[in-house]
Amino acid sequence: MVYLPFLLIFNLISYFPSSSHAQNADLILPLKAVNLGNWLVTEGWMKPSRFDGIINKDLLDGTQVQFLSTKLKKYLCAENGGGTVVVANRPSPSGWETFRLWRVSESCFNLRVFNKQFVGLGSQGVQAVSDTPTDTETFEIVRKDDDRNRVRFKASNGLFLQAQSETLVTADYAESSWDDSDPSVFILTIVNTLQGEFQITNGYGPDKAPQVMQDHWNSYITEEDFNFMSANGLSAVRIPVGWWIAQDPTPPKPFVGGSSIALDNAFTWAEKYGMKVIIDLHAAKASQNGDEHSGARDGFLEWADSNIDETVAVIEFLAARYGVRPNLAAIALMNEPRAPGVTLDALTKYYKAAYDAIRKYTNAYVILSARLGPADPKELFSLASTMNRVAIDVHYYNLFSDSFSGMTVQQNIDFVNNQRASDLGSLTSANGPLVLVGEWTAEFARNDASMEDYQRFAKAQLDVYGRATFGWAYWAYNCDRNHWSLKWMIENNFIQL
């Protein structure tokens, strides 16, 4: 870490080191940026082959599963969602019949239920009452060799879980068969999966994960990429990072060290090619949105007031380490906090504290991400008005909502030209904060679009998002899905910046 002497008081509450003023003197807004997604924070959908070397790669942390008793033809269920017994009496599955895996080893798991307790052994049978998993909440999932969705559960006592009746599930079965009449046999259905940083590092385990991650960091983004980006008109990169970077080189397991060195390299390369850097805290400890890219273990959003101090500490680490870098443009405090799980009150407390932490080291811009879900980005305006050099971050995708599924190409373009332009215009005012469209892409919910269609859609977004006062950042630079990859889009003449 680098600590600089304080020089002057700014805005009554902010202190800046002397070098910080020169730092942003050459910052030209608006920025034309691209996100270096799936580099320092894993998003498996962007390059699925990264997971190919994991044994039982379909059973990673956070995989949501359901189990049908072959004998009873009923689903296992955590009665009342948890806090009591496990039964096998549901004819169809829903929330209480869905379990989230915590991976202990290649074949051993904890099963977390709807109310967040763990399935375990009890005196009256199998129950879901423990808030913390121990050996008695750990089960080996034994899969049939020629039918991987046919499973049995070996408990810590060495015996198998069985559905004796619809209301009695025990772990006392010693027989071994795969017949439908066997009460210990269940049909596994995978409902949802996560492929984030926790999943890939815990999936490979402590022996393999360090090398797997290092190889990825060294190859996925290189100096040549910064040369390419700069040569094609980009002025900045937005780099997602996870909370574990602050504990390099020995972050808590299963995360592995090395991401801070990769980020160091990015700053050096960016400076060489005349580019600025936005550091984006994409993954906060306890997860601010439950998505895989937040570093979540099992998809539960659990970030709250109790996590504010440790999240501020991550921001302070970033500001201390990179605040002296002349090409630091901004630090984004938290990516996509989701409402109502993350309350405005908690977020405001965090944003205030994180802003103050940054101002100990640098006058770089501070970016406040708008909440996802039922929240208005303008809810941050009053907070932003008390701060200096801040921007509000909004993300615009013509995806992830049923409202886009039936749109024609022209309707997608019209939506950008009309609705998105209106949304962006409402956030832009002479006295308000700057605005960053921190994520957007040229993909939409069409599988019949032509090259010209994509070109028109991309151009419409460039025209509209070009009005954002802080700038925009395309998602992403490198991706297996072509239209999500700005590098591919440029190389194949689908977009002109």
Language-model features and meaning:
Residues 2-22:
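Cleavable N-terminal signal peptides of Sec/SRP-targeted secreted and luminal proteins
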Residues 60-192:
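Lectin-like carbohydrate-binding module/patch detector with strong preference for beta-trefoil
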Residues 44-59, 253-258, 286-305, 389, ...:
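Aromatic- and acidic-residue-enriched segments that line the glycan-binding/catalytic groove
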Residues 63, 210-211, 215-235, 252-282, ...:
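An active-site-proximal structural segment forming one wall of the substrate-binding cleft
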